[in-house]
Amino acid sequence: MPSAKQRGSKGGHGAASPSDKGAHPSGGADDVAKKPPAAPQQPQPPAPHPPQHPQNQAHRGGHRGRSSAATANASSASCSRRLGRVLNFLFYLSLVAAAAFSGWYVHHVLEEVQQVRRGHQDFSRQRDELGQGLQGVEQKVQSLQATFGTFESLLRNSQHKQDLTEKAVKEGESELNRISEVLQKLQNEILKDLSDGIHVVKDARERDFTSLENTVEERLTELTKSINDNIAIFTDVQKRSQKEINEVKMKVASLEESKGDRSQDVKTLKDAVKEVQASMMSRERDIEALKSSLQTMESDVYTEVRELVSLKQEQQAFKQAADSERLALQALTEKLLRSEESSSRLPEDIRRLEEELQQLKVGAHGSEEGAVFKDSKALEELQRQIEGLGARLQYVEDGVYSMQVASARHTESLESLLSKSQEYEQRLAMLQEHVGNLGSSSDLASTVRSLGETQLALSSDLKELKQSLGELPGTVESLQEQVLSLLSQDQAQAEGLPPQDFLDRLSSLDNLKSSVSQVESDLKMLRTAVDSLVAYSVKIETNENNLESAKGLLDDLRNDLDRLFLKVEKIHEKI
């Protein structure tokens, strides 16, 4: 019995060793171990039968008690052996079941550990990918900062170019003001000369021929009409130039306002970039919180990459536009330099023309000394030359409007004409002195009449020249004054001339021819000056066209910058 109990206790302890996971087998072993002590108690119920004879029964009872104890011991021994075998079987069976269950549990735990390890590996890989994405975003932010730096440099360059254009506009405005002043001065001088000519004509009207008086009046009316037309043209040019200056000022003011707005936008973009950098630093510290929004972040990164690619393309287009603008400005500066060089060469050309004029004067004097008695042929040749000059000066008449643009330089030619008119006045005074010393004769009167007729023809030719050159009244009026004074003095002194002074009279006629040839050379010089002024006006028009193209490029640049600002704001909102 004790052995059975010990075995039952061992079986119970052996089955309870995997008690954490196999509680039911150990419970069954304990129940089996507890049942054997109940088996020997079954023969005890006959004991309570009361004996009839206590003494005999006591003797019989002792013998029967020993026999029953022996049988009970034998049966208990066999039962204990059987129970031990059963218990051993159950113990081994429980051990095998516990080992199988523990193996299955260990396998399950290993699978869970592998799954957890794979999850940790995926998480670390996602974390590395997220770190690489953040590094790429940092690099993109740095590239954005670099692009913003280049953008600021471009803005500074555009501001410098705009300052240069403003300076050029101011210089043009000052030159236009100077031109307007010169034109006003020229207008006053023309009006003064016209009034002086009217007074001279009124004084000479009493002494002159009636036909000459009528022609002079017609010429004066035509001259006043041409002067009024020129004055109207000058005022229109002044109004147009002032209007263009006001428009340029308004455009410059609008550009300055847009420049201020752009500078504010650049400052806001800088602040936004700084905020983006701060947010990126905070996001690096909050990597664990970004696991849930990893997919959305990847999609945002893809869209941002596409937008950055488009932004890079737009930046390249912006660089190309800036390069084209720079080339246009360089071409404009080169054209301005060439125009300045051509304007600096104008005084040398004028000086050279003056020297050629003096040489022509000397040659004309030498040729006229040898052709004293060939005055009629010379006058015919002079008329043909004047007709040729009229055909040539038709081109000048077509370029009068372009000359008005460069009237500042035309004033120099007018000043030279005034100086030449003074020289003509001096020569006229010399002629008057020569005529005052002369006498009268019939031959001399006929020569004077022929001279008057030739002068009338010359005045008719000069009328056409005045219609084509309305800016040159001083020279023609001085020539008319010479002719009128010569005719009046010849008419007053025609009857008291001595015949022996005929050669002196011819010399005065030669002097008159020389003065006419000098007028012709002066007209040629004026034609060359007008051609140079036309070329200069064409250059000015090309410069104005270049300025307009530069303004158009600046407008395109402003539109590109506005689009770039919109793209950057969209990127900032998405970040």
From Swiss-Prot:
Residues 1-85 are cytoplasmic. Residues 37-53 have a biased composition (Pro residues). Reversibly palmitoylated. Palmitoylation at Cys-79 by DHHC2 is required for its trafficking from the ER to the plasma membrane and for its perinuclear localization. The keyword Cell membrane applies. The modification Phosphoserine is found at S3, S17, S19, S211, S292, S367. Residues 1-73 are annotated as: Disordered. Residues 125-193, 236-438, 507-575 form a coiled coil. SUPFAM superfamilies: Tropomyosin. It is a single-pass type II membrane protein. The modification N6-acetyllysine is found at K21. Residues 109-575 are extracellular. Expressed in cardiomyocytes (at protein level). Interacts with REEP5. This is Cytoskeleton-associated protein 4. It comes from Mus musculus (Mouse).
